[in-house]
């Protein structure tokens, strides 16, 4: 085998070998592998078979049938078949395959071609690669998965199961009765049984009449229909005779004297099942029959005498206390029965005679003024004068007699006070607010307050005038000269050294109350012969110090000897009674020697004298106390505990409890089980003077000086407290423009404030409430157009009705002169009413005695209606029979289309009205109205309007203004607009975010930190300043106030009253669902919400959580918004779409919030880290520290970071909920839009937050850049990069195409926008964003707030002819500027309060043309190039087409400039063209400079919406500041 002589000798030798041996075949194969192809061919010829032939692997023998055969077969398979297979595989890999490869690579090919062929081949390759890059790599934007715009959810009206009488028999009877007595509020079991145990039922047949003036009790309809008629007073008198005289003229005729047969009756209202036939005022009359209008013993001492009239009293008169009582003071002494009070031009017989003689217990009446009794005067004992009821069908009525109310007042005084407080609240919400704000009956309403002064005027003692008052004034004069005008205008308070005593904790007060309650069980109470000498030292000290103590001790020699014999004679008749903290000063014994040093202080003497006068004005004397004290021990735990809601509020001026000072929610539900807190307070409550109230309130009185022109109380705000006038005059008036213009719900809040005084919201920064400083120009303008109503003289009290009943002020109160007042904050009044409900009963008595006849009839006809969540009030097409005023809750008006779709027309919150247009025009209902949640309504029937229109035509003028305003709104915003189809959604209308009162925070699933989220949102709402404040509720807060029975069936009504109280008290209430999904509190949070915030963790799974399933099961129609919490300020593309994909019920939008949170708690024993991990972290820390000093990059926080004050995410959400969002609208204009980047930077530096962004064309591009990161730094970089691409002409040149549709293909334009935004979606933007386009397929504008950003920004930037339209769901979209280049109206519809609109559009040449009736194109061309021609150049064809395209846009632009709340900005960018993108820096600086100058101008004018001007600081200017600027 080593022979190399040639192949033949070797081959011949191989012929002698056996060809069947595998060794020779292997050798021949080995030789073939190393020989040439010729040798292989020769070998093939000798062997007679091809060289590639290999023997196939042998087949295994057939399987035997015996056991031995099986063993032989296996042996043969292992030692024969397997080696053959291995041999075949090795041979193929080592011989056959290399042979094939060698043969292939040994071949040679020759191609011959010319240069043209090579060029074509190269061109083909380049084209193929270009096509691949262009349409497969650079065209990625066209292959994104389809993400169409999110369809807004259709509104579903759930079946109305509330209609009709579904419960027959006894169940229906009970339901109607219970619904009728809901007017009393929550009634505990003993109180309910006491009221109903003497109830009587009466059957009326159809047509039977009932004289309600003969029915002395509370009447209600159980089953049937009753019409209420009133006797007409149209007897030839002019309407002016029936107006209330605010000038104080008491010479009026008695009502009802001219009754003759010509007078008929007019229909007031129709009373159906479950409604009351009695008015609120008549109910108050039933409760207050035994209450005095004015206390008599208030004049029983010279210290509390009636001021100047005492100068006419002889010296001998004080020897008898009774002589001083009946001193002739006809001006101060009111009518005994109240019949001679001027009420609407006539005397009002509305209440039964007040037997004050019996209550006073004085037999001698010869000292009464002559005006007490009028000869021939007819005294009516009815609380329903001139009211007749007629049954339309067979009717069953129930009557609770007056005796039941009298007994209830005696047995349960605190429960009575609670009922009176509820009725007073509803009286203000229903009757007074409707008469004042809706019907324009301001004179009638304010006349009650004016005439209330004759009950509340008590002069200071004579000793407090003269030299003492001069010394007091000197202190203020010195301080006034030291302070500036601005500080003095806020008021100067006299320093109170004892003010620190007020700040004792409530727990200490409760302990003290409980201790004194145990000490009060001494045998002193039943003694009848007690005297001052028998009092212990502790009792003397507890009795408190009064001005009388000063006079009876060391001051006697100073003021004269006449007081030495006065004190014992006055004290002796009352010696047998228990000593009262409100006893007149001279009725007390000698004071404790420990108080003598303090009695020298004249300031303390002033304070105590003022407190005495205020208490007498409130009706707090020993005699009035004894009226309710008879059965105080019987009014045990069954009566509600009279506690204020928040005992920590020392800032009385900020409390606005709707139920005033009586909180009926501290007691238990069933009256049998009590919580420990309630029990501890029970001992301090009631009418027993356990804690010395005088001692507590003495330090709360503040003496304040207001210079002339200062504002003490503003119209629409809650009274901060009582102002007692020491010296000077207070002018009570109202803005002249408000008379007749303050319409309830006259327009959407975009046109002004809500009209009900219960909701005074700041609509814009330039509104009336934006500046409270009296020295401001706004205040001066208000004073000039102000109408003065009446003056409050020294000794009078301002704010009595508003403070005690917790009403809002209908008037402004200014200082007519330099005025010195004593101020008692409302928190102190709460403590008074806690222990002495007589204060509320006295107020109720006085109100009923002063009620005008007109208001009585309105009160009779107005019906208080309570509807459940989801209940339909009326359907589309129903007959219009009443106007509805929203007292509490929220309504939604829905328009049902012919195709079954429902579009939201509007939403109505607290204080708004609905339905007046169709009622006055007697047309059918244009839409369906349903309650979003549990709602209280005031039903104003059409019959009442007809009755008022006949007797008081002035009311028709007022309502006519309302109808005209509503018609104007319909013209500007038609009800059938298609906004639900192509706008921002079916729920996101202009009214959906306005007037939200309750917001629920609901987690998507368990584990979401809703409590921390709620606290942060609450802090943000406090900082931006919500009108009337904001509070939050969780289950713990509810249980603390209502006890463990808060969520039982018995406690449901109590809970609803408590929540309604909070809604009236605060501008917004947050409900935090911090319990499990099936808890009653979670259900309460859902049913009470105007808006529900579904909070979820963005990084968690977007599946539907258990709370959402529970929410869907509740079938609520409230507005629902999604809040996604992010750990970092970044949202990955497509994340929001995954959350919204399956949540079709999210109808209010979504919000991205950055909030640091921890999903899992830290382990108590942290795990030890590995050495490598620790070393890596340490190196990273060191590296970061080194880069701080070596890196050239400037490290700074973004301008729009979450930590920036007033610009964080929670503040943005808070402004959204309050309807105070700041919108930014960017117009289109090509390269001129670069100036918008500079304007946005100027807004950032000015500290103005931006919440919503909308744009058109280049404005859509810039707005999307800013909305993506909410930061101007990345926006600047991306905008400059895009401008560089747009400035390159080569890109457009390479994108040119045959101009059938456009000059370019649009690819380069698409590519530039896609490189900027990528696959981001509008839902992922950090700020809310939209852009508008023009749909030329359907000839309408469209607004896009979801989908891929690049597509709709590209569509909004599409210029016709230059770029082809973009296709979207079959429609072609073009530049939105063709229809509306500045979308301010749409931004306003999204709820933005202040809108910055930046217009960068081109200005067309408006030069007058005069080329004649015909035009030669040759002449026009020559004239264009002729420098000496004076004829203006005619527009070209392209210019004419462009102007034609923008015709509608110009009209919308002019409308946008005049939109309320819009701040129009136009930088000086006219010299720049549409395609001047190469001048980026120059145009940017122009916009930045203009923005700085414009905002500085707004700041100097005071119209810039600065973050410092919040409601809380406005209140501080007038309330807390005077306390600080003290002497």
Swiss-Prot record:
Q: How does it sit in the membrane?
A: Multi-pass membrane protein
Ranges annotated as spanning the membrane: 70-90, 113-133
| Annotated residues for binding of a nucleoside 3',5'-cyclic phosphate 1 | 685-804
Q: Enumerate the Cytoplasmic topological stretches.
A: 1-69, 134-1527
Q: Which reaction does it catalyse?
A: a 1-acyl-sn-glycero-3-phosphocholine + H2O = sn-glycerol 3-phosphocholine + a fatty acid + H(+)
Tell me if Nucleus is a UniProt keyword of this record. no
Q: Which UniProt keywords apply?
A: Endoplasmic reticulum, Hydrolase, Lipid degradation, Lipid metabolism, Membrane, Repeat, Transmembrane, Transmembrane helix
Entries under Pfam families matching the protein: cNMP_binding, NTE_Ploop, Patatin
What's known about how it's activated or inhibited? Inhibited by organophosphorus esters.
Motif DGA/G: chain residues: 1375-1377
Question: Main localisation, per the record?
Answer: endoplasmic reticulum
Which segments constitute the PNPLA domain? 1224-1388
Regions of compositional bias (Basic and acidic residues) in chain numbering: 355-373
Which sites are catalytic? 1257 (nucleophile), 1375 (proton acceptor)
Task: Tell me the residue ranges located in the Lumenal compartment per UniProt.
Answer: 91-112
Q: Which GO terms describe its cellular component?
A: endoplasmic reticulum membrane
Residues bound to a nucleoside 3',5'-cyclic phosphate 2 are 846-966
What Enzyme Commission number(s) does the record list for this chain? Answer: 3.1.1.5
Compartments where located: Endoplasmic reticulum membrane
Positions of the UniProt region annotated as Disordered:
240-259, 299-387, 576-596, 750-785
- From the UniProt record, give one GO term of the biological process aspect: phosphatidylcholine catabolic process
Gene Ontology molecular functions: lysophospholipase activity
Q: Where is the composition biased (Low complexity)?
A: 761-771
Function of this protein? Intracellular phospholipase B that catalyzes the double deacylation of phosphatidylcholine (PC) to glycerophosphocholine (GroPCho). Plays an important role in membrane lipid homeostasis. Responsible for the rapid PC turnover in response to inositol, elevated temperatures, or when choline is present in the growth medium.
- Please give the family membership noted in the entry: Belongs to the NTE family.
Name the record gives this protein: Lysophospholipase nte1
Say which species the protein is native to: Aspergillus terreus (strain NIH 2624 / FGSC A1156)
């Amino acid at each position: 085998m080593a022979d190399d002589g040639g192949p033949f000798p070797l081959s011949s030798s191989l012929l002698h070998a056996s060809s069947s041996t595998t060794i020779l075949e292997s050798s021949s194969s080995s030789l073939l592998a190393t020989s040439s192809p010729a040798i292989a061919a020769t070998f093939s010829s000798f062997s007679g078979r091809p060289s590639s032939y290999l023997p196939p692997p042998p087949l295994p023998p057939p399987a035997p049938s015996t056991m031995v055969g099986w063993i032989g077969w296996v042996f043969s398979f292992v030692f024969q078949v397997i080696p053959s297979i291995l041999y075949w595989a090795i041979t193929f890999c080592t011989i056959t395959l290399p042979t094939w490869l060698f043969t292939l690579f040994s071949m040679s090919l020759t191609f011959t071609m010319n240069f043209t062929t090579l060029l074509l081949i190269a061109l083909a390759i380049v084209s193929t690669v270009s096509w691949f890059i262009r349409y497969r790599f650079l065209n990625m934007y066209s292959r994104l998965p389809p993400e169409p715009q999110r369809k807004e959810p259709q509104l579903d009206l759930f079946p109305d199961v509330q209609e009709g009488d579904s419960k027959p028999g006894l169940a229906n009877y009970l339901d109607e009765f219970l619904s009728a007595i809901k007017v009393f509020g929550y009634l505990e079991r003993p109180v309910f049984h006491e009221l109903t145990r003497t109830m009587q039922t009466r059957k009326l047949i159809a047509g039977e009449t009932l004289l309600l003036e003969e029915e002395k009790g509370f009447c209600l309809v159980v089953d049937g229909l009753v019409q209420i008629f009133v006797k007409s007073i149209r007897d030839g008198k002019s309407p002016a005779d029936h107006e209330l005289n605010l000038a104080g003229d008491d010479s009026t005729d008695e009502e009802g004297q001219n009754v003759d047969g010509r007078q008929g009756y007019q229909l007031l209202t129709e009373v159906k099942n479950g409604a009351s036939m009695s008015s609120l005022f008549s109910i108050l009359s039933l409760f207050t029959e035994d209450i005095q209008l004015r206390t008599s013993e208030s004049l029983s001492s010279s210290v509390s005498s009636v001021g100047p009239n005492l100068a006419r009293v002889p010296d001998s008169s004080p020897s008898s206390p009774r002589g001083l009582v009946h001193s002739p003071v006809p001006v101060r002494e009111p009518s005994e029965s109240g019949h001679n009070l001027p009420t609407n031009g006539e005397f009002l017989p509305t209440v039964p005679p007040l037997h004050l003689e019996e209550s006073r217990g004085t037999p001698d009446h010869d000292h009464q003024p002559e005006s007490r009794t009028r000869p021939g005067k007819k005294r009516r004992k009815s609380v329903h004068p001139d009211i007749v009821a007629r049954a339309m069908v067979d009717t069953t009525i129930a009557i609770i007699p007056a005796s039941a109310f009298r007994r209830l007042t005696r047995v349960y005084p605190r429960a009575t006070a609670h009922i009176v407080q509820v009725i007073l609240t509803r009286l203000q919400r229903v009757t007074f607010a409707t008469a004042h704000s809706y019907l324009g009956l301001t004179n009638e309403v304010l006349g009650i307050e004016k005439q209330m002064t004759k009950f509340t005027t008590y002069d200071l003692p004579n000793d407090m005038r003269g030299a003492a008052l001069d010394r007091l004034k000197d202190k203020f004069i010195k301080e006034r000269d030291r302070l500036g005008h601005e500080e003095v205008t806020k008021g100067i308070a006299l320093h109170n050294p004892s003010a620190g005593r007020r700040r004792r904790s409530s727990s200490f007060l409760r302990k003290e109350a409980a201790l004194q309650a145990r000490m009060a069980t001494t045998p002193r109470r039943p003694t009848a012969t007690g005297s001052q000498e028998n009092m212990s030292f502790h009792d003397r000290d507890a009795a408190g110090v009064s001005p009388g103590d000063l006079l009876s001790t060391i001051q006697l020699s100073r003021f004269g000897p006449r007081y030495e014999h006065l004190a014992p004679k006055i004290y002796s008749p009352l010696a047998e009674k228990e000593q009262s903290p409100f006893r007149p000063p001279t009725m007390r014994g000698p004071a404790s020697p420990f108080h003598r040093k303090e009695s020298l202080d004249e300031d303390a003497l002033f304070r105590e004298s003022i407190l005495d006068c205020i208490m007498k004005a409130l009706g707090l004397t020993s005699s009035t106390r004894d009226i309710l004290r008879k059965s105080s021990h019987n009014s045990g735990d069954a009566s509600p505990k009279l506690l204020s809601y928040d005992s920590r509020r020392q800032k009385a001026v900020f409390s606005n409890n709707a139920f005033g000072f009586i909180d009926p929610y501290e007691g238990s539900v069933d009256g049998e089980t009590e919580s420990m807190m309630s029990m501890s307070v029970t001992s301090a409550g009631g009418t027993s003077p356990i804690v010395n109230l005088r001692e507590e309130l003495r330090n709360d009185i503040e003496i304040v000086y207001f210079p002339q022109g200062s504002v003490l109380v503003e119209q629409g705000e809650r009274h901060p407290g009582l102002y007692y006038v020491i010296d000077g005059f207070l002018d009570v008036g109202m803005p002249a423009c408000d008379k007749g213009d303050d319409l309830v719900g006259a327009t959407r809040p975009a046109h002004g404030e809500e009209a009900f005084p219960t909701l005074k919201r700041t609509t814009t920064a330039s509104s009336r409430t934006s500046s409270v400083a009296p020295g401001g120009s706004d205040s001066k303008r208000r004073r000039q157009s102000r109408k003065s109503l009446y003056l409050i003289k020294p000794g009078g009290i301002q704010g009595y009705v508003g403070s005690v009943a917790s009403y809002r002020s209908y008037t402004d109160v200014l200082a007519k002169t330099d005025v010195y007042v004593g101020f008692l904050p409302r928190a102190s009044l709460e403590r008074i009413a806690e222990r002495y409900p007589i204060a509320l009963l006295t107020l109720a008595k006085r109100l009923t005695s002063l009620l005008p006849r007109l208001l009585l009839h309105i009160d009779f006809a107005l019906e208080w209606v309570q509807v459940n969540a989801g209940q339909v009030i009326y359907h589309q097409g129903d007959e219009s029979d009443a106007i509805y005023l929203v007292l509490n809750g929220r309504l939604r008006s829905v328009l049902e289309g012919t195709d079954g779709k429902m579009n939201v027309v509007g939403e109505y919150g607290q204080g708004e009205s609905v339905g007046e247009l169709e009622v006055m025009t007697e047309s059918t209902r244009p839409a369906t109205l349903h309650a979003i949640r549990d709602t209280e309504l005031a039903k104003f029937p059409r019959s009442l309007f007809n009755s008022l229109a006949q007797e008081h035509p002035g009311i028709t003028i007022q309502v006519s203004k309302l109808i005209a305003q509503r018609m104007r709104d319909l013209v500007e915003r038609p009800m059938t607009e298609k906004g639900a189809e192509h706008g921002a959604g079916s729920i996101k209308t202009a009214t959906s975010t306005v007037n939200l009162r309750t917001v629920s925070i609901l987690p998507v699933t368990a584990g979401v930190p809703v409590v921390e989220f709620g606290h942060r949102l609450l802090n943000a709402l406090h900082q931006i300043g919500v009108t009337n404040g904001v509070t939050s509720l969780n289950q713990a807060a509810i249980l603390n106030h209502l006890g463990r029975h808060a969520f039982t069936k018995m406690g449901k009504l109590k809970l609803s009253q408590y929540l309604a109280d909070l809604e009236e008290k605060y501008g917004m209430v947050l409900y935090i669902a911090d319990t499990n999904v099936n808890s009653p509190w979670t259900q309460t949070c859902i049913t009470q919400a105007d808006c529900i915030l579904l909070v979820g963790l963005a990084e968690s799974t977007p599946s539907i959580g258990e709370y959402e399933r529970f929410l869907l099961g509740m079938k609520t129609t409230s507005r629902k918004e999604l809040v996604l919490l992010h750990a970092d300020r970044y949202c990955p593309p497509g994340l929001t779409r995954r959350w919204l994909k399956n949540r079709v019920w999210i109808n209010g939008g979504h919000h991205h919030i950055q909030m640091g949170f921890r999903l899992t708690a830290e382990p108590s024993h942290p795990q030890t880290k590995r050495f490598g991990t620790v070393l890596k972290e340490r190196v990273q820390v060191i590296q970061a520290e080194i880069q701080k000093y070596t890196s050239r990059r400037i490290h700074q926080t973004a301008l729009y970071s979450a930590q920036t004050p007033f610009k964080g995410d929670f503040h943005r959400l808070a402004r959204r909920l309050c309807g105070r969002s700041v919108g930014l609208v960017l117009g289109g204009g090509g390269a001129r839009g670069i100036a918008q980047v500079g304007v946005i930077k100027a807004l950032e530096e000015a500290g103005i937050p931006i919440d919503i962004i909308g744009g058109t064309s280049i404005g859509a591009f810039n707005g999307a850049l800013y909305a993506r990161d909410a930061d101007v730094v990345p926006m600047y970089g991306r905008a400059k990069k895009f401008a560089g691409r747009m400035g390159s002409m080569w890109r457009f040149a390479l994108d040119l195409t045959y101009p059938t549709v456009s000059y370019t293909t649009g690819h380069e334009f698409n590519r530039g926008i896609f490189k900027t935004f990528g696959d981001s979606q509008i839902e992922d933007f950090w700020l809310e964003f939209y852009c508008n386009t023009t749909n030329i397929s359907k000839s309408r504008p469209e607004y896009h707030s979801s989908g891929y950003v690049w597509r709709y920004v590209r569509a909004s930037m599409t210029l016709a002819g230059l770029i082809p339209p973009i296709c979207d769901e079959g429609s072609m979209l073009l530049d939105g500027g063709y229809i509306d280049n500045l979308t301010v109206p749409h931004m306003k519809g999204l709820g933005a309060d202040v809108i910055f609109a930046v217009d960068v559009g081109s200005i067309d040449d408006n030069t007058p043309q005069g080329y004649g009736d015909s035009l030669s194109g040759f002449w026009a061309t020559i004239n264009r190039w002729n420098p000496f021609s004076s004829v203006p150049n005619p527009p070209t064809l392209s210019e004419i087409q462009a102007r034609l395209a923008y015709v509608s846009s110009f009209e919308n632009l002019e409308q946008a400039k005049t939109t309320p709340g819009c701040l129009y900005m136009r930088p000086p960018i006219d010299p720049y063209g549409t395609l001047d993108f190469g001048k980026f820096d120059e145009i940017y600086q122009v916009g930045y400079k203009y923005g700085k100058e414009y905002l500085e101008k707004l700041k100097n004018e005071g119209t810039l919406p600065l973050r410092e001007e919040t409601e809380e600081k406005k209140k501080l200017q007038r309330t807390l500041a005077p306390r600080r600027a003290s002497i």
